[in-house]
Regions:
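Solvent-exposed, amphipathic alpha-helical segments
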Residues: 98-101, 141, 145, 227-238
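Histidine-centered catalytic/metal-binding microenvironments
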Residues: 175-267
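Catalytic-core regions of glycoside hydrolase
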Residues: 1-138, 148, 152, 156, ...
Length: 267
């Protein structure tokens, strides 16, 4: 039955790229109601949230919303459009560029899924101002790692850097609702950084390139810091003071390098 309180005239499917509710029929869940979804047949907007609390880090669910928006447009009767609901939006610019192109079509009533291979090639060229096969390959790796929803479904937003966490031997997160789980292959992201650097002389005058390069390098450093923290914990537990001291120095140097990369990012 309908709640006794006033029913909203429209809804935001707030985190639809990860946990869509527009097609929820279980009344025990947000948006769900017996006998029908779409918030009891109320106009609603498919939203991308992505960022919680301004957390830094490369993270997104590209394939989810590229497919999800098209599927919703074909199946839903009350979808009113798309929107973004991030708690901060100063990182991962590719997400927003792509998100708003998902409904850019000659026939709005017949949306088609974007060809991501073609889209990424065009994106790299227009963002960096030149063709670059290595930069495109780097983007493919980002799509397969940090922007792959199969690897980024933990709690809220991007994996947090252990550098931001309270010091400890076992670090699971830097904040209450965060996580520090990096479940993609970290070596692949290092390869993406190498590929971006391959055409540095060709692309260095592009502000977009410099921004993306700094963000990728910062994420690589964050991932590396996580590995050193684990080694430090192991050295501490084994009582190897010399090894712990050596690893600590390297860990601190990673923090300095990450600070340098953050300083280079022109937001």
């Amino acid at each position: 039955c309908l709640p006794k309180t006033a029913w909203p005239s429209d809804f935001l499917d707030l985190y639809a790229e990860k946990t869509p509710h527009w097609n929820e029929t279980n009344p025990g869940y947000y948006g769900g109601a017996e006998g029908g979804g779409e918030f009891l047949n109320t106009p609603w907007v498919y939203c991308m949230l992505n960022n919680f609390g301004g957390r830094l880090g490369l993270h997104g669910h590209i394939d989810n919303y590229v497919e999800g928006i098209v599927n919703a447009s074909k199946q839903a009767e009350h979808m009113a459009g798309i929107g973004i609901t991030p708690e901060a939006s100063v990182n991962n610019p590719v997400l927003y560029d792509l998100f708003f192109e998902t409904i850019w079509a000659d026939d709005g009533n017949n949306l088609q899924k974007i060809n991501l291979d073609k889209w990424f090639k065009n994106y790299v060229t227009r963002r960096y101002g030149a063709d670059s096969d290595s930069a495109y390959q780097a983007m493919e790796i980002l799509h397969d790692t940090v922007y792959n929803p199969a690897y980024n479904m933990k709690v809220q937003g991007a994996p947090e850097s252990v550098v931001n966490a309270r010091p400890g031997l076992d670090i699971g997160a830097a904040s209450t609702w965060g996580n520090a789980v990096v479940d993609y292959d970290k070596k692949k992201l290092e390869k993406a950084a190498e590929l971006l650097l391959a055409d540095y002389d060709k692309l260095k005058n592009s502000a977009g390139y410099q921004y993306d390069l700094a963000n990728v390098l910062e994420q690589v450093l964050s991932n590396t810091a996580q590995e050193y923290q684990k080694k430090m914990a192991a050295a501490f537990r084994s009582g190897d003071a010399e090894e712990f001291s050596t690893l600590s120095d390297k860990f601190l140097s990673i923090i300095d390098k990450a600070d340098d990369e953050r300083a280079d990012i022109d937001e």
